[in-house]
Every structure is written in C-alpha cells, then in structure tokens.
C-alpha cells in the first residue's frame, strides 16, 4: 500500500518511516501533503511535499492510505480526517513497529510513536494519536480522535472519551472515566471521573472550566 502523510512538520515521522520500511520493506511512502502553500513542491528530509488536501480525491484508491499527522488540536485532527474521508480517501494506521499490539483492538487512522506501551485488552478507536513513552494500562478504552501526549500514564481499566486531549506527563488513576472532548492539562493527576468538555489541571486534578464543542463524538467515518 502507498501511504501519504499529511503534515510536513515533525522530523520524528521520518524516523518512523525508516523503521516501518525496515520491518515492512514493501511499504511505500511517496511523500507528504501539507495545506501550507509555501511548502508545496518543497523537500522534507528527502521526501517531496506534493500539495494539500485538494489532492486526496485524485489519489484515492483501494491501495492508497492517508495518515493525518496533526496532533496539536484534537478538533483540527478530527476535522481534517473527516475531510480526507469525504474526499474518498481511506485512513491508514501509522504505528511504530516496535509497539506490541497483541491482545489489543485498534481502529484505523491512528498514529502511535516509538516507545508507546499498550497493555493487554486495551481498545483504541479511530484517528487517535499517542506520542512517545505514553503508557495505556490494561483493559482501558480509548475513544476516537483522542490525543495522548508524551509520557502520559493511563492506569488500568480507564476510559477516555472521543476528542479528549491529554497533556504531557499527565497521570490518570485506575478506573477513572473521562468524557468526550475534555482537556487534561500537562502534569495533571486525575483521581476521579471527568465530564464531557471539562478542562482539568493540577494535582489532584480539578475542573477549572468547560469548553463547549459542536461534536457528539470523534468518529470520522
């Protein structure tokens, strides 16, 4: 399958491409797409930047997948992936080959960096991103269009709803349920359930406000 990557910004994706190609020699990565017109026809660490989302429809086929690399905003990631699917593109997983996914369930369009740990009986939806050294404890359920930042620790039997953003080094204690489109601040320690749209910071985590979002869920297809 040919895999096109959307978002020519993070050089770590180049190392992931090389790792995937070492483990799967027939994996093809023709280049990147980026909506910044200044990047069109430029070079990103040896890979061409071909254009923006407008090219998806012309490239879409059964043997072509698209990877959304947007991670800074779960809302932007959700909307961009919806546009890819609406244009006829199919989302592909971009997962570092060192990650053990046995005894887990994972959807499509997910982006998991090196050193992510996914324990047994974890379920992950679609269009979710996890950065380096995040740990997802056993029997946890992670929704769609979720972002898990570097060094986040999600304990066993937790639930994280669609569209939720979990900041760097946050800790989610066992059996905690976090709703949809919530925001967990960097370094927060979440000790109890969090409702939809809540913003949580501190240790122990406390709700400081709510942000209304116009989405029921984070599903993209």
Residue ranges with predicted function:
Residues 1-19:
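Glycine-rich adenosine-cofactor-binding loop
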Residues 2-4, 29-30, 63-66:
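Short active-site oxyanion
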Residues 5-7, 33, 69:
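Short hydrophobic segments within beta-strands
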Residues 19-26:
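A short, Lys/Arg-enriched amphipathic alpha-helix followed by its capping loop at the start of a domain
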Residues 26-43:
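NAD(P)-binding Rossmann-fold cofactor-contacting core
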Residues 38-100:
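Phosphate-bearing ligand-interacting subdomains
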Residues 94-201, 205-208:
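Structural signal for interior beta-strand "rungs" in well-ordered beta-sheet cores
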Residues 201-221:
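…primarily DNA-binding HTH/wHTH and HhH modules…
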């Amino acid at each position: 399958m040919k895999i096109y990557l959307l978002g020519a910004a993070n050089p770590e994706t180049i190392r992931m491409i090389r790792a995937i190609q070492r483990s799967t020699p027939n994996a093809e990565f023709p280049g990147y797409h980026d909506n910044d017109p200044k990047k069109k026809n430029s070079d990103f660490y040896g890979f061409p930047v071909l254009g923006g989302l407008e090219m998806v429809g012309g490239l879409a086929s059964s043997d072509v997948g698209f990877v959304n690399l947007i991670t800074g905003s779960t809302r932007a990631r959700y909307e961009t992936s919806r546009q890819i699917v609406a244009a006829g593109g199919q989302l592909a997983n971009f997962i570092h080959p060192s990650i053990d996914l046995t005894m887990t369930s994972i959807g499509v369009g997910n982006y998991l960096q090196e050193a992510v740990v996914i324990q047994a009986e974890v379920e992950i939806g679609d269009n979710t991103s996890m950065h380096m050294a995040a740990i997802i404890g056993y029997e946890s359920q992670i929704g769609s269009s979720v972002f898990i930042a570097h060094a986040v620790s999600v304990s066993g039997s937790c639930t994280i709803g669609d569209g939720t953003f979990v900041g760097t080094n946050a800790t989610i204690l066992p059996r905690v349920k976090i709703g949809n489109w919530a925001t967990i601040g960097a370094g927060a320690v979440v000790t109890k359930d969090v409702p939809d749209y809540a913003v949580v910071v501190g240790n122990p985590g406390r709700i400081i406000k709510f942000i209304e979002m116009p989405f029921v869920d984070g599903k993209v297809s």
